[in-house]
Amino acid sequence: PSLAAHFLILAALYYYIRGRREGRCFFPGLLALNCLTIAVHPYFVPMTYALTAALALECAAVSRKPLPCLGSVAGNLVGTVAVGWLFGLFTGSASGGSEVEYGYFGMNLNALWNPTSRWNTLWSRVLPVQNQTGGNYDAFNYLGLAMLLVGAALLLWSAVHWRQTLALLRRHWALVLVCLCLTVFAVSNVVTANGATLFTLPLPHALVRLATTFRSSGRLFWPVYYLIFLSCLVFLLRRLPSVHWAALGLAVLAAVQLWDISPALLTRS
């Protein structure tokens, strides 16, 4: 149940957006969030800290005052480690009782449009289930039909207006960087597409052991997933002429999304 606490990721995204708008990298709420994260589930720690680091790096670049931003991240780390120590997370064995190493639970390259998860649950009325390998099921990241349609429109718009897209990416360069890092870690050194393993990148054994701390690596794509989701929503809402049209657009979007994923909702209910 603790892995369902995705509000932690959304809250970290909120502080990133707010921090960029206000030009500040330290928030007491963000410190509390990072401390809470390690108490809820350690898997969320690299996710919220990726967004915390992105905010600090971009604020440091804009203000040209890196020390306050580095101090902010250091303060967050000290608080998080203290809470983890109080909860006993740094004592005893780190083994979860499984011999599976990093790479087995990597994210398949079809994850965003593959509507199947653990126990072969069907998540779409429209899109067919595609093959997976190994533990790809643990990296479930299906966007849903409505978001895939809006996402396709967003990609097309971004390609046509590529100068605006590049300017936006440059403005949020650290966020792009941490998203790339999270995606690479989620895919892992065992790169899979549909039912095939495309290649396995050999890594030093010590690095594999370290990465195995988060062996269910596909979960680390969740911040990128929510960023894609929110980007699609913003793209749609900004192209509707009024609040009334925006409300109607959201209603249609939600209806299509719920209709598409209803098989899984009915199964799980």
Outline where the language-model segments fall.
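Membrane-interface helix-loop junctions at the exits of transmembrane helices
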Residues: 1, 84-93, 111, 115-124, ...
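Membrane-interface micro-motifs in multi-pass membrane enzymes
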Residues: 1-13, 39-43, 141-143, 200-227
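Hydrophobic alpha-helical membrane-interfacial segments at the cytosolic entry of transmembrane helices
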Residues: 64-89, 99-104, 108, 172-181, ...
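Membrane-interface transmembrane helices that cradle and orient dolichyl/undecaprenyl
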Residues: 10-27, 37
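Perimembrane helix-loop-helix junctions
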Residues: 16, 46-77, 154-165
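Signature aromatic-anchored transmembrane alpha helix within multi-pass, membrane-resident enzymes
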Residues: 74-78, 180, 230, 236-266
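Periplasmic/ER-lumenal interhelical loops and adjacent helix-loop junctions
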Residues: 83-158
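Transmembrane helices and adjacent periplasmic/lumenal helix-loop junctions
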Residues: 28, 32-58, 78-86
